[in-house]
Amino acid sequence: MQIREVFDRKRFVFLDGGMGTQLQARGLQPGQKPELAALEMPEVLTAIHTDYANAGADILLANTFGANAKKLTGCGHTVEEVVSASIACARKAAETTGACVALDIGPLGELLVPAGTLAFEDAYKEFAQVIRAGAAAGADLVFLETMTDLYELKAAILAARENCDLPVFTSMSFESRGRTFTGCTVESYAVTAAGLGADAVGINCSLGPKEILPFAQRLCRSVPAGVPVFVKPNAGLPNPDGSYNLDPDEFAAEMKEYAAIGVSMVGGCCGTTPAFIARLHETFSPLTPADKIPIRRSCLCTPVRFVEVNGITVVGERINPTGKKRLLQALRDGDSAYPCTQAVAQAEAGAQVLDVNAGLPGIDEAATLEQLVKDLQAVTDLPLQLDSSNPEALSRALRIYNGKPIVNSVNGEPETLEKILPLCKKYGAAVVGLALDKGGIPPTADGRFAIAQRIVDAANAAGIPNEDIYIDCLTLTASAQQEGAVQTLEALSRCKRELGVRTVLGVSNISFGLPCRGYLNTTFLTMAMSAGLDLAIMNPNTPEMMAAVRAYRVLTSQDLQSTDYVAAYADVQIQTTQTSKSAATVAEVGAAAPGGDALFEAVRRGLKAEARAAADAALTMREPLDVVNVSLIPALDAVGDGFEKGTVFLPQLLQAATAAQAAFEAIKAKIAASGQAQGSKGKIVIATVKGDVHDIGKNIVRVILENYGYDVLDLGRDVDPERVVEAVRQTGAKLVGLSALMTTTVPNMQATIEALHAAHLDCKVMVGGAVLTPDYARDIGADYYCKDAKASADLAKQLLG
C-alpha cells in the first residue's frame, strides 16, 4: 500500500494489533525491555510483524513504543540503534504484502510541567530524537499513540512536524468516563490535534470496542472532514488473570458498529493477536467507510475545558495592565501571584475565556507573556486569549499553550496579516481581526466591514476557516464619538450575517469618561448581544454585566432550562436602595459570600504563593496542628472528593497538592523554630516494580500522601524485590505501595509481594496501575487495590490514621 492510499477512504485501512502481549507469549522474559526485541530476538519480532501483515494489516507499527532516551537509559544501546533495528524488522515483514511501516511512539513516562517536572521543550527534544531516527531508518509515517496528556501530545506533534515530512497519526487513551487519565476531553483532543496538523486522529487502548464507540462518535463529529479517524481498542475488558474477555469473533462483531460512524481505519491494541486482525479484515473488507460529517463549530479549549462559542461568551478582561497599577507592578516585578488570583476570581465570577496581555513599556513582552501563560495554565482551566500584536511574543506563547487559544489580534495591515496569520495556522489558534488599518478606525460601518472582509479573505488564504475568525468592529467612547456606537453595532451585525464569522467587542470602552459607567456598559452589552455579539471582553466581577449575560442566555434559549441562571441566582436576594447619584442601585446579597478560611481557599484553588502567605498568617494566631487539621487536610479532602466525582481533574489535584506543600513548609519552619518534634502519621514505602519504567502514577501518589502528613520513601522505578524488602525492614513501614503499568511487569509485582511475605514483615501491600483490577490484585497476593492517588490516601488514613 502506498501511504497516500491511507487517506482516500475508498476502503477500510487495517492497522495491526497488540505487540507487548505477543512478545510475552513468544518468549519475552519478565524485566526484559520490549523495545530491545529487535536486537535480542529479531526473528521473533519479524515473525510477529509477518503474522500481522499476512492477517491483512496495511500498517505495521514498529516495536518502538518506548524507544526514547529516558526509557532506554542504561540498556547499552542508543535510540538510533534501537529504532533502526526495529524499523528494519517491520520493513522485512512488510516486503511480501506491501504494508506501510509506522514509527510507533508512546508517552515518555513523565508528567509535563505544571502537573509534573518535565519541561515542554525537554519533552519536545526527546520526541524529536526518536522521530529523526525513525525518518532516517525509512519509516512511512509517525504514529503517536496511547497518549493521556494533551500537552505531551502537542510536544510530540510539533517534534514530528518540525523534524520530518512524514504523515502524523495521533491517538489518545480514554477512561470509561470519557476523559483521559489527566482529564482531557475527546473534543479538546480532536480540535487541538487537528489544529496542530495531525493527518489522522484516533483512540486506542484502555477499553474495548463497545466502550470506546461513543467516544469515537464524538471524535468523528469534532475533527475536520478531511482528517481520517481510526480506532485500536483492546480485546474487550481485562479478566482477573490479565487476559481479555473477547475472542476474535466477538471483537469483530463489536467493531462492526464503527463502519457506520465515519471511522475509516481499524485495528487492535492490548490482548489482540493476528487472529483478531484477520477476523477484522474479513468483516470490514466488503464494507466502505461511511461519510464522516463533522460539526463545524467555533471553539476554544484547554485539555479539561471545551468552550463552544455558540452564543454569548464572556472573556475576562482583568489580566491587562492598562489602567491597573497593581497588575502593572506585578508584571514589572515578575510576580505571578497577582495575575493568578485575578484569573481564579474571574473564573469563579463566570468568565469562560481569559484575556492575557503583557504589553508594557520597559519589559520583555515575549518573555513575560510566555511566563504568564505557563503560570495561568497552572491555576485555571479556562482557555486563554493571547492579547498581543507582537509576533515573537505570540510565537512563544502559542508554542507552550496547552489546547486551542485565540489570538487578539491582527488588523487590516498587510504586514500584520503576513506575520501573525501563519502563526495562528501553525498552532491551531483562532484569531481576532480588528476593523482598522493604517488609516485608523473608519467612522462608518461600511468602512469597518470592508476591512473585515480583507481580514477574512487573508485568513482563509492562510488556511484558517471562518469558524476560527472573530471580527472586532471596535467600541468607541460615547463621550467622544456618540454616533460611533450605532456604527459599531451595524458593522458587527453585517460581519456576522454576510461574512459568516464570529464577533468580539471590548464592551467597557463605551463608557470611558462618563459617570455611572455600569449603566452604559450594561445597556451597550445588551444591544451588542442583540446584534449578534459572540465574545464579550468585559469585567466578569461586575454583577450587573454578568446578570445581563445570564438573563440574555435564558431569553434566547442558550441556557436550556435556565440551569446556569438558577445556579447563579437561586439564593440571591435583591435589595433596592436610594443613592444620591441615581434612582436606585441593585446589590446582590449572598451571591458570593467569601469563605472565612484563606488557607483552605488558597489550597483548594491551587494558589501556591497565597497558600504560603495564608499559612504564615494563620500560624500567628493558631497552633501548627490546628492549621493542618482545620485548614489543610479539609482542603485536600475537598479537592480529592471533587476528583472522585469527576469535577476536579489531575492537574488541579496536583496544583492543590503543590499549594498545600508550600503551606506545609511554613508549618515545618514554625515547628522547628519552637523546638518541638515534627510528627509523622506513619511511614510508607512506594516503588515501581522491576522492569517497569513508568512512574507517573506512583509519583502522584507520593505527592498526595506526603501532603497528608505521611513519611514516604520513594524507591523510584525498575526496583528489585530485594530493595523493597530491605527498605521496609529498615524503616519499619506498615504500608507498601507497588505500581506497574505493563502486563509484562505484573509478574515482578507478584514476586515483590511474595518476597515481602517470605520476609515475614508486618506490613500491608497496596497496588495500582493501568493493567490491574481488584480481582487481579487479589490473585497476585496484594492486600489492597487502589485505582488512583485519592484511593491510596483514603487507605492510608484507614490503616495508619
Which role does the model predict for each range below?
Residues 1-801:
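Domain-level signal for soluble alpha/beta catalytic cores
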